[in-house]
Amino acid sequence: MDTPNKDDSIIRFSVSLQQNLLDELDNRIIKNGYSSRSELVRDMIREKLVEDNWVEDNPNDGSKIAVLVVIYDHHQRELNQRMIDIQHASGTHVLCTTHIHMDEHNCLETIILQGNSLEIQRLQLEIGGLRGVKFAKLTKASSFEYNE
């Protein structure tokens, strides 16, 4: 019979919060359909670990993955070409792009990137700063190991 690894077991601990923070936490649980406070707290911890992994690890190791979501006015002259030029000039690998037409004026592009964290963030800032770009959000990902 296998004995459970202590790292795999769920540990109960308590947290002290001000009432307004607890109320906000409970509102998010309901709004996002979590089954418990624990589920939301686990997700928040995982998100923070990914964020910290991006900051703490060697930023030049080239192993970071991110998704850049861009919404832009496709009528803006030469914007598509400038976005492509920035991607090609970057030291970041563009693994995949997806382009959709949201409406008569707006397009949404997702760009999956791999590279070092500084280059990926620089690419996001450059594209986000272009005239006609309405939204440029970078979602960071990490494949660090943790036990669930």
Swiss-Prot record:
GO terms for biological process: response to nickel cation. The keyword Transcription regulation applies. Gene3D superfamilies: ACT-like. Chain A, domain 2, Met repressor-like. Keywords: DNA-binding, Metal-binding, Nickel, Transcription, Transcription regulation. Binds 1 nickel ion per subunit. One of its GO terms (molecular function) is DNA binding. Ni(2+) binds at residues 88, 99, 101, 107. Its cofactor is Ni(2+). Homotetramer. HAMAP family: NikR (MF_00476). Belongs to the transcriptional regulatory CopG/NikR family. NCBIfam families: PRK00630.1 (NF001884), PRK01002.1 (NF002169), PRK02967.1 (NF002815), PRK04460.1 (NF003381). Transcriptional regulator. This is Putative nickel-responsive regulator. It comes from Helicobacter pylori (strain J99 / ATCC 700824).
